[in-house]
Amino acid sequence: MALDIERIKEELSQATVLELKQLIDALKEAWGVTAAAPVAVAAAPAAGAAAAPAEEKTEFDVILKEAGAKKLEVIKELRAITGLGLKEAKDLAEKGGPVKEGVSKQEAEEIKKKLEAVGAVVELK
């Protein structure tokens, strides 16, 4: 059975973002694949060269260590970042813990910057 590439392209062009997301999830499940970027295989190092550096981490967890002196400002920022309710954000500010998990390096850095700007102590793992 030959694929009609143009027809498939037209169908996909008319699909909503939600429909495309569902299609992607169904294909991942059917084919047993993940969205992880493939890791390039490095060439063998030259004689005497050091081993290849470790893989760079792509997903980060943003951990709140301490709210600092401006706890109210930290709570407001936590609510804006996470969408948590007032009580949940207050508990997180008081006890510390994960703010967001499995985010990109750029997003993790932005969250850390926002929280540190209001006096919080934040760690990226």
Swiss-Prot record:
Query: Could you give a GO molecular-function term held by this entry?
Result: mRNA binding
Q: Which GO terms describe its biological process?
A: translation
Q: Which SUPFAM superfamilies match?
A: ClpS-like (SSF54736), Ribosomal protein L7/12, oligomerisation (N-terminal) domain (SSF48300)
Keyword entries, A-Z: Phosphoprotein, Ribonucleoprotein, Ribosomal protein
Read off the InterPro entries from this record: Ribosomal_bL12 (IPR000206), Ribosomal_bL12_C (IPR013823), Ribosomal_bL12_C/ClpS-like (IPR014719), Ribosomal_bL12_oligo (IPR008932), Ribosomal_bL12_oligo_N_sf (IPR036235)
Q: Which CDD domains match?
A: Ribosomal_L7_L12
Superkingdom per UniProt: Bacteria
Q: How is it modified after translation?
A: The ion at m/z 13016 is probably phosphorylated; treatment with phosphatase in the presence of kinase inhibitors decreases it weight. This form is only detected on 70S ribosomes and not in isolated ribosomal stalk complexes.
Subunit composition and interactions: Homodimer. Part of the 50S ribosomal subunit; present in 6 copies per ribosome. Forms part of the ribosomal stalk which helps the ribosome interact with GTP-bound translation factors. Forms a heptameric L10(L12)2(L12)2(L12)2 complex, where L10 forms an elongated spine to which 3 L12 dimers bind in a sequential fashion. Contacts protein L11.
Q: Which HAMAP family match?
A: Ribosomal_bL12 (MF_00368)
What task does this protein carry out? Forms part of the ribosomal stalk which helps the ribosome interact with GTP-bound translation factors. Is thus essential for accurate translation. It extends beyond the surface of the 70S ribosome. The stalk is preferentially stabilized in 70S versus 50S crystals.
State the family it belongs to.
Belongs to the bacterial ribosomal protein bL12 family.
Query: What is the protein name given in its UniProt record?
Result: Large ribosomal subunit protein bL12
| Species of provenance | Thermus thermophilus (strain ATCC 27634 / DSM 579 / HB8)
